[in-house]
Amino acid sequence: MAALSELLGDLVADVDGLFLFTPSSSHYEQFAETDVPTVVIAPENTVEAETFVELPLQFQNVKDRIRFGVEGAMEQSIVEAGDTIACNVGTFGGDPDSLVRVRVEENMRSGIYDLFANSRADPGVIRDVFEVAIELGKKGQKGEPVGALFIVGDAGKVMNKSRPLSYNPFEKSHVYVGDPIVNVMLKEFSRLDGAFVISDSGKIVSAYRYLEPSAEGVDIPKGLGARHMAGGAITRDTNATAIVLSESDGLVRAFKGGKMILEIDPEAY
């Protein structure tokens, strides 16, 4: 019987890269003997792989896990559009147990990896806020389109560069994004003016904030309005991330460092 390494080599012989998702040391060693460039995608590089992409979040959905890992590899110029890769992922827990062939396409570079992996706030918090915006984009408020602005991270500086538009319903509360009840509250309050301010750890610091950063020199695409300009500007003056849902076109956009890093249709997410 052929050695396991030979069988594995045959399976991945014609691909441009082999992506191992969260492998154990023994599992990694089995693939390390193949001639195909191997990339480990995991929360930490515990196997000391030469080529590594951080996976800061756990994705239950295998498709989402692969998409996120591939985009991270594209960000690091490990792969490019046109490459074919083999993704070794786990579907039943434990070590990776399935092999999925993926052709890398340019449209896989959505900005989601940068949003989740490279923001100041906890990646799970960023994802929770992003998913609230996505759901609002899909369903709106009582079937009607709605806009919303979420400023995540560096909450102290954001509060110093903004002022209240109305009573802050979260002033003395200790509620966090990600809680289903809190998410419903966010959706309800999104009908009103102003931004939500959310801490690095996900605490809802305030609603109804009028952002007052200077907009000078902020580069946002033409056609976007005051909500996007305010979101872009506050991320230039602070280390926050802005997630914006447009009422007019229904798209979700994210800003960091004064620049737009993501634009996505909620229906395509």
UniProtKB/Swiss-Prot annotation:
Needed co-factor(s): Mn(2+)
Outcome of gene disruption: It was not possible to obtain a strain in which the dacZ gene was deleted in standard growth conditions, indicating that dacZ is an essential gene.
Keywords: ATP-binding, Manganese, Nucleotide-binding, Nucleotidyltransferase, Transferase
Cofactor: record remark: Cannot use Mg(2+), Ca(2+), Ni(2+) or Co(2+) instead of Mn(2+) as cofactor.
Induction section of the entry: Is constantly expressed at different growth phases in rich and selective media.
Gene3D superfamilies listed in its UniProt record: DNA integrity scanning protein, DisA, N-terminal domain
DAC domain location: 109-266
Entry-linked Pfam families: DAC (PF02457), DACZ_N (PF19294)
The family this protein is said to belong to: Belongs to the adenylate cyclase family. DacZ subfamily.
A GO term for molecular function: diadenylate cyclase activity
Originating gene: dacZ
HAMAP family: DacZ (MF_00840)
Catalytic function, reaction form: 2 ATP = 3',3'-c-di-AMP + 2 diphosphate
Biological role: Diadenylate cyclase that catalyzes the condensation of 2 ATP molecules into cyclic di-AMP (c-di-AMP). c-di-AMP is a second messenger for intracellular signal transduction involved in the control of important regulatory processes such as osmoregulation. Is essential for H.volcanii. Overexpression of DacZ leads to cell death, suggesting the need for tight regulation of c-di-AMP levels. Cannot use GTP as substrate.
Protein name per UniProt: Diadenylate cyclase
Species of provenance: Haloferax volcanii (strain ATCC 29605 / DSM 3757 / JCM 8879 / NBRC 14742 / NCIMB 2012 / VKM B-1768 / DS2)
EC number: 2.7.7.85
